C-alpha cells in the first residue's frame, strides 16, 4: 500500500463520526460508483483490543473504493493497526488529523494533532514503513 492512492477521484466523502456508516456509504454508492468513501474513524485501541475481527465487516466488496480511517497518536500502535486493516482489503488507510469531536480530543487524536506535527510525521512514517 502506498501513502498516496494512485487513483484520482472526482468526489471524496470525508469520514464523519455517526454519519458515514455502512448504510450511508451504500446510499452514496447508489449515487456514484466512483466516489472515494471512508469508514467512520476507529481508534487504534479499539482495533488492538478487539479479537472478534469486527472491523473487517465495515464494508463489502461492492462498496469499493473505501478507505479505513484510523484515529490515534501512537506511531507503533497505528502501524500495527494499519497491518491489521490492510489485511481486510480496504483501498486506503487514512489517519485522522481533522476530527474536532470531544471524543477525539480526549484521546489526543483528530484535530488536536494539528498542533503536534512531529507526532503526525512519526505516525505517518511508521504506518507507511510497515504497510
What are these regions (language model features)?
Residues 12, 24, 77, 81, ...:
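General structural feature for long, well-ordered alpha-helical segments within catalytic domains
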Residues 2-3, 16-88:
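Glycine-rich, positively charged N-terminal anion/phosphate-binding segment
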Residues 58-67, 110-131:
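Alpha-helix-loop-beta-strand connector modules within alpha/beta enzyme cores
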Residues 69, 94-98:
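Short beta-strand segments
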Residues 2-11:
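Extreme N-terminal starter segment of soluble prokaryotic enzymes
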Residues 84-88, 96, 123-130:
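Mid-sequence acidic-hydrophobic segments that form the walls
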Residues 91:
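Receiver (REC) domain switch/active-site residues of two-component response regulators
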Residues 41, 45-47, 97-118:
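Glycine-rich, proline-tolerant flexible connector loops at the mouths of alpha/beta enzymes
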Amino acid at each position: 500500500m502506498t501513502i498516496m492512492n494512485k487513483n484520482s477521484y472526482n468526489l471524496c466523502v470525508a469520514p464523519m463520526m455517526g454519519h458515514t456508516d455502512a448504510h450511508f456509504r451504500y446510499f452514496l454508492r447508489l449515487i456514484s460508483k466512483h466516489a472515494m468513501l471512508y469508514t467512520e474513524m476507529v481508534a487504534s485501541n479499539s482495533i488492538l483490543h478487539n479479537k472478534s475481527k469486527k472491523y473487517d465487516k465495515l464494508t463489502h466488496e461492492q462498496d469499493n473504493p473505501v478507505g479505513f480511517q484510523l484515529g490515534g497518536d501512537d506511531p507503533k500502535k497505528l502501524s500495527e493497526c494499519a497491518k491489521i486493516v490492510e489485511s481486510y482489503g480496504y483501498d486506503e488507510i487514512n489517519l485522522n488529523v481533522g476530527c474536532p469531536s470531544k471524543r477525539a480530543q480526549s484521546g489526543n487524536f483528530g484535530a488536536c494533532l494539528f498542533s503536534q506535527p512531529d507526532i503526525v510525521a512519526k505516525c505517518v512514517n511508521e504506518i507507511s514503513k510497515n504497510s
